[in-house]
Amino acid sequence: MLILSVRYRLSILFLLTSFSLFAQNKTEVERSVSATAVPSAARAWLHETYASTPRLHWYLERSSGETSYEAKLRHRGAWHSVEFDEDGTLQDIEIIVGLSALPETARRGMAAYFDTTYTKHRIRKIQQQLTGPPEVVRAVVQGEPDEEVTYRYEVEFYGKNRRSKALWEGLFDDQGQLLERKRIVLRPTDNLMY
């Protein structure tokens, strides 16, 4: 009986820690900064990659204890968000896309996830995420296809099931399989009306 009890307790502990790692909270704070506050390596990479983009805005972002710099700009008709670490090294590029722009396999995989996990859901925003070596990502942004770039999809959605109703951010792979899910925590000042 004691052995069964210990196994039972270990199983419960494992399940609880697995769920807590899988569904963490996301609290993100952004504030506008001048270009001079951004590492020169980030500015140089951005200038080489998006040479013809006249306007861009820089932000300092704090999320989950990490600090990064983010440039937001419009390129070829789509909104791009380019994120760099504190040293100015490229982390990823996120491009706002519609559901129809996703590959069919990714759409089907996401639909299966939403249908089995939620009684109701509504997609708020989809961003195609590009990661890889900076020079390869640059080539893809400039229109050259490359196999070394990893494509993922960051999806903000409202989800409702028997247990909860919340705003979530899910990271899906190119097959539409959920890799990570975080509950988006809105600060009270995010919703102030003036």
Where are these predicted regions, by residue range?
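Exposed beta-strand-loop-beta-strand "reactive/processing" segments of non-cytosolic proteins
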Residues: 50-83, 138-171
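Bacterial Sec-dependent N-terminal signal peptides
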Residues: 1-27, 46
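A short, surface-exposed beta-strand/turn
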Residues: 80-92, 164-186
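N-terminal short leaders/motifs
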Residues: 15-37, 111-120
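Long, charged/polar, surface-exposed segments that mediate recognition or autoinhibition
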Residues: 86-129
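Short helix/turn-capping signatures at newly exposed starts of structured segments
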Residues: 24-67, 74-78, 85-98
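Surface-exposed interaction/gating patches
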Residues: 117-132, 136-139, 149-154
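Acidic, serine/threonine-rich low-complexity disordered tracts
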Residues: 185-194
